[in-house]
Amino acid sequence: MHVLARWFDRRRSRTADVSRDRAGHNGTVRVAAVAAVAAVLLAGCADASRSQGRADGTSGFTPITVTDCNGVESVIKSPPKRVVVLTPSVLEMLLWLDLGDRVAAIGQEPRPGSLPQRFAEQVAAIPSLSGKYTAGSGYKPVPREELLSVEPDLVLGGFGSNFDAAGAMSQKELATDGIPSYLALSTACRSAVTAPRTGFDLVWRDVENLGRIFGVPDRAQRVIEGMRQKVASVRAKAGGLKDTARPTVFPFEYDEGTTTPYAPGNRQAVNAVIETAGGRNVFGDRDEAYTKVGWEEVVARDPQVILVIVYDRGSPAANDAHFAEAEKFLVTSPALRGVRAVTGKRFARLVYESASVGGVRNADAVVELAGRLSSAG
């Protein structure tokens, strides 16, 4: 019995020791497991942080200095996150760069149709500082109080009036308040256009500068490369044409009036579109963006093609109706009888936003126009 009792005592002792060992082992396992999970979570957070940094441009951002149309040099210390954009053409560039989430506000509500339909939802969600768009109202500058109320870390403009109009905040005033600004080179920058516009370098410089400012240079290069490929596909066919083989084109901006037409000269974006597409602007000898001419001068230059340009109405049906209205004016105007483009009804169609405003859609305009010109030479 004593022997049996001692055996049971030893058995209980060994069982207790094993239980303690298992408890200690399980505790160690649990601690190790928790540590492993924590490490995974921390690694995941770090990866997410790095991914977010790459996505928003903050990862490894080095301060840069960028120079704009006015020669204003702005130091960008970190990618802007609360941007105010004062003109639709520059807003569109940001949208092509997938930077719509950085826009805190726009100046005036964009005119319907002025931006691609694909961006409509994003644009509708952006607050306007100068109120709703009103047809014929002209540019409404953003008052100082309204602009500063959104605490912008960057202000972007496309026209000098964005900063110079009465009531607008100047770039100097913005700088005094510690807010950098940038006036685009490709929209209406006279100082940047010192020779005829025959390409899209100014657009590419703006896109590249915006890519640097926001820390997304790779996105900018993809957008630029997409434009280059479209342009190259046309230049491969039209680039070798002699001037005499290029159809002459009168770019007619219908919405600017019909009594005395505005003739885009060689400093205007549409000149680059026409030249790249394989045509010749009949007013390409004018070293200015626009000049008012009489219809008799259009008749004297006798264009082979009239490029009808209208403001985008926001839908294909509305645009077609407006193009048809413009073409009806041309074919019924007594002043234009005998003009080759009119008698042959050789009309090409482009919306103003892709043809006459420097931007990403210029490359699409080139492709569209080239198709029409190839059968009109």
Placement of each model-derived feature along the sequence:
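Bacterial Sec-exported substrate-binding components of ABC uptake systems
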Residues: 2-36, 43-96, 212-252, 372-377
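Second-shell loop/turn segments in exported
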Residues: 80-81, 133-134, 158-162, 191-197, ...
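Short helices/loops that flank or line small-molecule/ion binding pockets
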Residues: 141-154, 169-172, 177, 293-302
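Structured C-terminal subdomain patch of bacterial secreted/periplasmic proteins
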Residues: 197-206, 308-377
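Alpha-helical, coiled-coil/dimerization segments enriched in small aliphatic residues
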Residues: 262-290
